[in-house]
Amino acid sequence: GDVNPPVHAWAAWRVYKIDKKHTGVAVTDFLERIFHKMLLNFTWWVNRKDTEGNNVFEGGFLGLDNIGVFDRSSPLPTGGHIEQSDGTSWMGMYCLNLMAIALELARTQPAYEDVATKFFEHFMYIAEAMNNIAGEGIELWDDQDEFFYDVLHVGNSHMRLKARSMVGL
């Protein structure tokens, strides 16, 4: 089945900030423990949902509307694969949230500065890939429509799937 978007870091960061505001105490032990689990989870996403290794993600997850025009987790009848704008956006957000957590942990443990830099760099790779998949000039963004679309790859050809939904916002 479809996987749900990687919102773990966003949720942990929100819980941490709300608790800190409510109690006046920064419980970084919680943040650090969950951060290490999310490092493993992030690696799973990169290894399983970026099968082409180009920082554009696929694999069926939606999250906002959860209703696709077709089953994005099943093999396509035409072969090929779909580069998903929503999945790629979710992973960009995951990077930014992990970076924020690493920066918070770096306040007392400078070793996390390098980890924060890693997530900033990965975010930049994702942003670049959305505008130039694998350096081939293929974009998820459509300048004319001012909208992000999924891209269907079959063999050496590609085409934007111009179906407007929450996916492209």
Feature roles, as predicted:
Residues 2-3, 54:
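Membrane-interface helix-loop-helix modules in multi-pass inner-membrane proteins
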Residues 3-14, 88-103, 164-169:
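Well-ordered alpha-helical segments within folded domains of soluble proteins
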Residues 19-93, 106-157:
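Active-site acid/base region of carbohydrate-active enzymes
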Residues 152-153, 157, 161-165, 169:
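Polar, glycine-rich mid-to-C-terminal structural blocks
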